[in-house]
Amino acid sequence: MNISGIKDCYGCGVCATVCARQIIDIALNENGFLEPRITDEGKCTNCRLCVDVCSYSHKELSLKASCVKSFAAWSKDAAVRRKCSSGGVGFEVGRTLIGEGYKVCGVRYNAERNRAEHYVATTIEELIPSIGSKYIQSYTVDGFKAINRNEKYLVTGTPCQIDSFRRYLQKFKKEDNFVLLDFFCHGVPSKLMWDKYVHWAEKQVGSLTYVSWRNKFTGWHDSWAMAIDGSEKGESVKWHESYNLSIREKKSFLNTRLSQGDMFYRLFLSDACLGKACYEKCKFKYENSSADIRIGDLWGTTYQDDEKGISGAIAFTDKGNNLLMKANLECVEHPLSVVAEGQMKECAHRPFFYKKLMTLLKDNSLDIEVIMLRSGGYLKSVSYTHLTLPTNREV
């Protein structure tokens, strides 16, 4: 038995990581989502490892835990807090563990390959590209395969990625070597949509060299913003005005926000083109997690006047709680209802025009501006301060 019959799954890539025969490939399907395929059935030994580590194939989570403590949290380092999407908890956890001899498997955006991808960082400098949210599906395989199970790691990812990865660690009895961190996940949009958005951006700034999905130029509550560096030479951009932490030369620069009608965010936050599993089979909303720590924006009324950024942080294990206490963080304990107030309580609902939108996204002759004109009237109104509004179900 293997994962050959699985379609429209989470695309976490752990099956490809665990396969000793190296016959599982993770690639984009026709709708622009990662999924596995067996490249040579004849070499399969039916060891079942790929199925055993597959979160999509199990109803229960791999960690039977409940919230130990929940916090509002933010970095004590003002520069870190300013550059991170919310409060900087993820970076501070990584920085603390690197100081203790851990490596970090996090996510960066690879502009040359136009994808988010997992990679291994061993120094603080190498950790910097992991700063900030990346609201597209991450290719995990190379990063996960680079991990040595006998060493100590922090591994971050979406809840489904982390649930599968914990199953992988349990198979080899290596959980003690790892700290696992996930986040409140909205779902992942189709790569077809992202590719069209990139094409639109490149017409303005040339080939992309860096992308940031969030910035606080106008405050944390208006931080749903794309900040993009292009290859074309442009006006000088001061370092503190760019979200690229490594900018060193004149580059063209694009900044577009949800509050100004940014097309990526209009489609993404309207739940218009998420993966099938995000609509139908996500079991990780609210406090359901297999991680030691879950993080995300602490939206809601308690910190509605804060514009520097506040993270919600939930410890599901004593390991996670102890780590939050010793990291360079200001932590204020709150009930879970406060920490997760603005987060999704259930799966997104597939809109009735989903199939039509996917057809438009597959049409190579259509730019994203045309697609927005044809579908914009169907998109729900999205408030950038509260993202759990209802939408029409598919009929």
For the regions a language model picked out, list residue spans one by one.
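Flanking helices and flexible, charged tails adjoining ferredoxin-like Fe-S electron-transfer domains
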Residues: G42-R149, V339-K356, L366-R374
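Gly/Ser/Thr-rich loops at beta-strand to alpha-helix junctions
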Residues: S85-G88, A111, V155-F165, G187-P189, ...
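Conserved small/polar residues in nucleotide/adenosyl-binding loops
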Residues: T385-T391
